[in-house]
Amino acid sequence: MAELTVEVRGSNGAFYKGFIKDVHEDSLTVVFENNWQPERQVPFNEVRLPPPPDIKKEISEGDEVEVYSRANDQEPCGWWLAKVRMMKGEFYVIEYAACDATYNEIVTFERLRPVNQNKTVKKNTFFKCTVDVPEDLREACANENAHKDFKKAVGACRIFYHPETTQLMILSASEATVKRVNILSDMHLRSIRTKLMLMSRNEEATKHLECTKQLAAAFHEEFVVREDLMGLAIGTHGSNIQQARKVPGVTAIELDEDTGTFRIYGESADAVKKARGFLEFVEDFIQVPRNLVGKVIGKNGKVIQEIVDKSGVVRVRIEGDNENKLPREDGMVPFVFVGTKESIGNVQVLLEYHIAYLKEVEQLRMERLQIDEQLRQIGSRSYSGRGRGRRGPNYTSGYGTNSELSNPSETESERKDELSDWSLAGEDDRDSRHQRDSRRRPGGRGRSVSGGRGRGGPRGGKSSISSVLKDPDSNPYSLLDNTESDQTADTDASESHHSTNRRRRSRRRRTDEDAVLMDGMTESDTASVNENGLVTVADYISRAESQSRQRNLPRETLAKNKKEMAKDVIEEHGPSEKAINGPTSASGDDISKLQRTPGEEKINTLKEENTQEAAVLNGVS
């Protein structure tokens, strides 16, 4: 700015040093030295150029000179007009011309100079031209050092950037400068742009060098991402990289797009590892049993979608049977997942847990099926045995335990109580109960409609006691296998029918596993066997009679009730006796009378003597 130095006349007539900042039509914008006055516009007639620096200083007595001095301590020094009165060596006595009163002062030679002969400036004293600056170069043009060479080339007094007009201002005292500016301005701007680019690259290289030196001793990790997963790793508009760079402690992240290599530098291992978690995308697969694929996917994909959402994986794919990209195991289907390493670990945990749960549920289901199959097998044997028909939910084994078999007195007592209730009940009650029994009786439990008591339906007269009496030499096993009446001795129609009704109300069920032939043996601790080694019907009745005689309960209290009950039962069921007990023809009765044995005669005698007892005891099963 020394070349644009001017002298501005103050109000006291002295000239003060200043600098031109801008040129206007009729004034100059001047900045004063040391800013002792604010910047202001000064008219041309109050501004002059300083004298040349190489002027010869020849001063003698009586010459007019200019003295560099100040009026007071608050003002800076300026050039005052004076006159030399006396000279003595290096000292000069001067007299100020601006003061009314004579004011003398002794000064040295350095503070004196000849009177400035330059006139005040005019409009054509200074020339100004402007150059528009592109937006990308405005910041660079604000530095005046960038125009040093250009200023020298064009001969300008001053070159500066004006931010309000975004123009480059060139001030000069020569008109030739304007022409040179028009020639060199474009070249100057290109050179600024080139230098700016080179400077920027140099700065980046310097920063990279410094960063590399710092990172050499810091933590860093390097990993490769597959090319088809590079888009996921970078993220939308580089969001993943930006997120990784925001991790506290991460200093730099570098990406080699050609090889897909990421390099992460940080101040700590944890920071580098955390940043890597945002960028490292991988693809992995999990084997799922083929029979569980549908349950893993769920209805409308609900289960697999929940697993994907909770784990954070990007996508999932099920490899088809015709694809052989991944290794397969027998009975397994690969599920392929894509995501960060953390999300892949999460989905592996979720899927393995769900598969283990499904396997456990399947195992429990199979165990239940096995149990149900065993129950069906057991139930099929129970249902098909002896023509008993189906049992209700409260069914228990009719034979009971060994203790029940060895103590028949308990069931005998229960039967007596039932008979007592029958005898004491009114006629209406008995009639209604008879109607209910008659509705249940025709089919019976596991019996045919005709009243036959054998398994699988009626067998005619062969299932009755009369058939046995007709043929004493026949095999008694057939009777025990095919009827339920082998536990009783039905000697006549009334007695058999009466005992049948009682057995329906209270009798102990037999299991299908009990031996039919030994049923008669278990009714008494001392079973009698005839000379052929077989148990006959007469022996069975004899045992029942002997057991009844051993009972300790008093029979007198129930004798009357038993007689009435037996009589009522015989009268009520008289018409159906023939149908129940077997053959109804007279020829059949005659044959049975002719073929009676001494054992059967004994049975009839016992029946007549103990009619009431036989009605109760012969029904024990």
Swiss-Prot record:
One molecular function GO term is: RNA binding
Which residue positions does N-acetylalanine occur at? A2
For bias type Polar residues, the affected ranges are 394-410
- Asymmetric dimethylarginine-modified residues are R447, R453, R455
The covalent link annotated as Glycyl lysine isopeptide (Lys-Gly) (interchain with G-Cter in SUMO2) occurs at K56
* Record localization: Cytoplasm, Cytoplasmic ribonucleoprotein granule; Cytoplasm, Stress granule; Cytoplasm; Cell projection, Dendrite
InterPro entries from the UniProt entry: Agenet-like_dom, FMR1, FMR1-like_C_core, FMRP_KH0, FXR1_C1, FXR_C3, KH_dom, KH_dom_type_1
Domain Agenet-like per the UniProt entry, residue ranges: 4-50, 63-115
Q: Where is this region: CC1 domain?
A: 201-208
- GO CC field: axon; costamere; cytoplasm; cytoplasmic ribonucleoprotein granule; cytoplasmic stress granule; cytosol; dendritic spine; glutamatergic synapse
Keyword set includes DNA-binding = no
Renumbered to this chain, the Basic and acidic residues biased-composition regions fall at 553-576, 590-610
> What disease does the Swiss-Prot or TrEMBL record associate with this chain?
Congenital myopathy 9A: An autosomal recessive muscular disorder characterized by severe hypotonia apparent at birth, poor feeding, ulnar deviation of the hands, laterally deviated feet, fractures of the long bones, respiratory insufficiency due to muscle weakness, and death in infancy.
Its job: mRNA-binding protein that acts as a regulator of mRNAs translation and/or stability, and which is required for various processes, such as neurogenesis, muscle development and spermatogenesis. Specifically binds to AU-rich elements (AREs) in the 3'-UTR of target mRNAs. Promotes formation of some phase-separated membraneless compartment by undergoing liquid-liquid phase separation upon binding to AREs-containing mRNAs, leading to assemble mRNAs into cytoplasmic ribonucleoprotein granules that concentrate mRNAs with associated regulatory factors.
Name this polypeptide is given: RNA-binding protein FXR1
**The species this protein was found in:** Homo sapiens (Human)
